């Protein structure tokens, strides 16, 4: 899996982003959390026509904010197979809120996500069918024995009749969890004692991530 290109801008810039669609299907890109003209928002058949296969599309909009954002395909289930990436907007150096020693630290974009070897269309179908398969893969199914033991046999039968199985918060089993499109990341350009600024986005389809740092507290 490879995430898409990494746009880095400074507040006050004008973004010009050319999308070359080399797919055999339509696509589009949505700029998550960005303030921009409606026609550049990237929702096919609503704010723009989809980008046809083997054509080029230009997104052009002013950058009027700063922060850590991300972008993703808004067509079909393309986001679930890796069409997403970080979108970083730096503060201007003359911004009165610019913090020396923080905003000028080396920045590392980190986009977290997940990966399943199942085709996204199959995942979508299995969720609609309320299958127990993903729960079985994660060893989180509730057996009839457990339901009887805990006094919830009637509830379990009623829920199954309603096709409301005992799913957890994230109903999909993932084969890998990714950082910038890989299952691990090495930052060999830094040494012990260096300070860096992580620009973190959650590009996952259904996963929550809890971040810890072996060296102590993370300043947010």
Name the predicted role of every residue range.
Residues 9-11, 53, 65-66, 191-192:
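Surface-exposed loops/turns
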Residues 28-32, 210-212:
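Beta-strand signatures of extracellular beta-sandwich domains
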Residues 39-52, 148-220:
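Histidine- and aromatic-rich segments of cupredoxin/plastocyanin-like copper-binding domains
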